[in-house]
Amino acid sequence: MKTPAWKITKLLLIILICFSILGCGIEEMKIDEEDMVGNVSIIDIYDNIEFDPRFKVDFGFGCVIKLGRETILFDSGSDSKVLLENLKLAGIKPKEINIVVLSHEHQDHTGGILGFLEKNPSIKIYVPESFSPYLKNEIASKGAEIIEVSKPIKITKGVYSTGQLGSLVKEQSLVINSKKGLIIVTGCAHPGITNIVKKAKELFKKEPYLVIGGFHHPPISVVEEFRKLNVKKVAPSHCSGSEIMEAFERTYQKDFIKSGVGKIIKI
C-alpha cells in the first residue's frame, strides 16, 4: 500500500525539526571576542608549594580571581580550615566571593568547598556535568546554586569555562579574556595542558598571555609546545612537578612566574 504524500511530508517536517533542536544543542557557544576585562588579580590561596611563609601549605590547589566587581574562587583545596585561614590572611572575606568554579572532582580541589559554603551558602557554583550526584547533592544541601557545565559557557564578563574536557578525568578550566591576551587557569590539567591551551585559542582566536595552575607532570617537550602556541608567561604550581617548572624557568626566564601559596599576580 502506497503511503500518502501528506504523511511523508509530515514525517520529513518532524525529522527536520528534530535535527534543528539537536543542532542547537550541539553547536558550540558563540564567543564575543570584544567581551574582555581590564585589570585582573590572581591570588594563589591554596597550594602545596610555598611562596609566602605566612600562608599554610597543604596539598591541593585553589586561587581567588579578582575582576573589579566580581571575585571568583577557582577550586577549594583539600581542607576548608586551611582555605578559610588562608583567605583570612589574604584579607578576603568568604562573602566577598560571589562565584565558585570547581575544575574536577578530586579531593585536593573540592575538599574545602563544604566548609566554605557554611560561611557563604548563597552562591553560584559551576561544576563539570560529570560530578557525582553525591557531591552535587552535598553542595546543594548547603544552599548553593549549582550550574552544571558540559560545553564552553560564559560565567561572567570576560570569563569563560572551556567546558569539561578529557575522558578518564573530566575537567574544566577557566579562560579570562584580558586586554593583554588570554589568561588560562587550570586545576590539574588532566586532559593535557597543551590540549587546554589549544581549546582556549580555538574558542577565542586569540593568543595566550598567561597559563597558571597545575600542569599535571607533563613531559619536558611541553615547554617547546608552549612556545609554538605563543604562550607569553607561565606560572605552573601544585601538581606540575619540579622538573617541568625548572625547564619552564630556564626557557621563559623573566616570563616565568614563580608561584605558590600566597603569590599575587596582577595583570
Where are these regions (language model features)?
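Cap/insert and terminal regions of metallo-dependent hydrolase folds
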Residues: 112, 182, 188-267
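Active-site metal-binding motif and surrounding structural segment of the metallo-beta-lactamase
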Residues: 81-126, 201-211, 227
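Metallo-beta-lactamase
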Residues: 127-172, 178-179, 257-267
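Zn-dependent metallo-beta-lactamase
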Residues: 5-11, 16-68, 151-165
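Short, structured coil segments at secondary-structure junctions
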Residues: 90, 121, 141-142, 229-230, ...
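Structural motif
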Residues: 40-43, 72, 98-99, 123-124, ...
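Active-site neighborhood of phospho(di)ester-bond hydrolases with catalytic His/Asp-centered motifs
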Residues: 73-77, 97-105, 126-129, 184-188, ...
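Conserved beta-strand hairpin/beta-sheet module of binuclear metal-dependent hydrolase folds
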Residues: 42-89, 171-186
